[in-house]
Amino acid sequence: MVEQEEADPREALADEGLLSPQVETWRHIYIDNYRDWFELARELNRYAVSLFQDHQDAGDGGPANAAAPTAVRVYGRALNAYTASIMLAERAMTIEAVGAVRPIHEAGFWLSLLATNPEKALEELDIDHHKHAVDREQLRAAYPGNAELHSASVQREAAHAALLGKRRPISMKALAASLPGDPGYLQYRLASGFYGHLSQNSLDALKLRTGDKGVRPILGPFETEIPKALFFAIDAMARTTRYFAALVKVRDANDILSALRTTLTDLGKADAEAGPQGG
């Protein structure tokens, strides 16, 4: 394992924090130190990108909001979030890396519903669209003073409210509960609650214990947490990819994803047995 040269990493971060150019040097060290983890993350990414490219034109010529093109866009959203998570993990910004996993799980929930009940999925997405549009227009209250813009906003809100009617958006908990098997809701809650939102637990990660039993606030990086962050990201993307593959009827996806998940499990076990490490 490569050790960092700086005796005190804070010196390199004193001026620009985690935007310091030094972090790019450390990034290569982290990737080398956790080579197997990052190779697995990229192997899954290559497969996921190939699925997206192969089915990018699904539903071409039909309505843009039909099930097939909607599913492709949902999967694209998951791919982008996965990319962000891996890039953050490469820089040992592990809290943020797991926080980026949340939309991957949400994409997986929607893809599973699109695969099992496309009519319901499209209706729920329509409800979500109009409810958020109403909420967005109501933000005008924070910016009073322009009567013309205010009037136009009221009209837009009324149009969306009429289309929304008495319908209410489904919660992620209810959506996940309606899906077959284990959609990964527990992992989603962990990614959302512990990492995605400011909480006492997430604040506890930003402190370094000193020799006098005190603590010192720090920004990071958190190298030893990289495997955990990558586990969250790979697990979420593998689930979501399985749902997308089922929707577009890719026959060999289960075998490929099962092999990737076996490697993920083996890496997790090896990391647990090795215990804390890193520079």
Residue ranges, per PLM feature:
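A cross-kingdom marker of C-terminal helix-rich interaction/assembly modules
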Residues: 1-279
